[in-house]
């Protein structure tokens, strides 16, 4: 089944599932909805607005999600309040979401073009992504629902396998005694809470701490179920940028139980609040969504994400326990692969723009331009590709790289229609001047 979601920038921010556009008062009742991110306040959009953007985006994490179940969130006040699936009133900010594509929305909303007038539209073909990601999903190794991955770490799957979650969200019980640490709570599906509750009961295990790597719903969704099972856990939930009633996590904070000393490591980039956790007894790192067991992750802020990957590498941890996928037996190698992958893409794009600048300067009289549009950059690197591949698969990530190169003073752009925007490599002397270095 094909469906469309349209992206639009204006003064508001809401996500409307295409199936619910009519209920939410879409201008056209044609199965289309709108994603309307925060108004652009700088040439590089929301990259400089991460704190506010995180507050708005964190409404996603409040959704009680089962497959394609929809939730409506009212965020008019500083705290987010779940209102159920009622029709919106007045000027409420509302979120209609299909959970299967939360991470896609998360990675693209900063970079998609605003278009003409009050906002342009970029169609999102759901079937394209489902076909692309289902192929990757089919190649994954099978993981058991519960497995002892080390002497002090037990992995319990969240029961939410899918194209965006690989085999499902990994949740971890850490420690060797009766008292344990739980890292992440999965999506909030009944299969997970039933599984972990039964395991805790039969093994006579109690939870001393519940640590959340970040705000995304497939990591925080099980919190209400845990508290419903055991109300005393309400005081034991820890998260960076905590929600009401939760405890904060700070960089370097230590959480200790028998057989496990866990240190919190602030690693923003995938999300603004992302934390990893270092298990000192094993020299192992719970990598959250920054590094996955299979394939590559996505980043909200590419610059901070790259810094976090390097910070993670500097820890020297041997083993990685990712939030999705199998155990990473060679974490240093995986981190190097991630860094080289991202840096390689930066080098390719900068090289393409540099070649065009040199060519344009040499043939200026013949009308050869010095910059390239995004489509022309894709052509220079990958050759001719179908438009839907460029728009749906490449544009979001490549735009993210261009904005990072802009922040690094390596690339500039000419203002104008984002769809036709010219990007160009800065000369070395201009790069030095922009960075405050002597020419």
UniProtKB/Swiss-Prot annotation:
Keyword Metal-binding: yes
Active site per the UniProt annotation: 218
Alphabetical UniProt keywords: Hydrolase, Metal-binding, Zinc
Presence of keyword Hydrolase: yes
Binding positions (Zn(2+) 1): 214, 216
Entries under InterPro entries matching the protein: LACTB2-like_MBL-fold, Metallo-B-lactamas, RibonucZ/Hydroxyglut_hydro, Sec-metab_biosynth-thioest, WH-like_DNA-bd_sf
PROSITE patterns according to UniProt: BETA_LACTAMASE_B_1
Cofactor binding: number and manner: Binds 2 Zn(2+) ions per subunit.
Residues that, per the record, bind Zn(2+) 2: 218-219
GO molecular function: hydrolase activity; metal ion binding
Pathway(s) per entry: Secondary metabolite biosynthesis
One of the protein's GO biological processes: secondary metabolite biosynthetic process
Pfam families: Lactamase_B (PF00753)
Domain of life the protein comes from: Eukaryota
EC number from the UniProt entry: 3.1.-.-
The protein's required cofactors: Zn(2+)
Function: Lactamase-like protein; part of the gene cluster that mediates the biosynthesis of neosartoricin B, a prenylated anthracenone that probably exhibits T-cell antiproliferative activity, suggestive of a physiological role as an immunosuppressive agent. The non-reducing polyketide synthase nscA probably synthesizes and cyclizes the decaketide backbone. The hydrolase nscB then mediates the product release through hydrolysis followed by spontaneous decarboxylation. The prenyltransferase nscD catalyzes the addition of the dimethylallyl group to the aromatic C5.
UniProt similarity note: Belongs to the metallo-beta-lactamase superfamily.
Listed name of the protein: Lactamase-like protein nscB
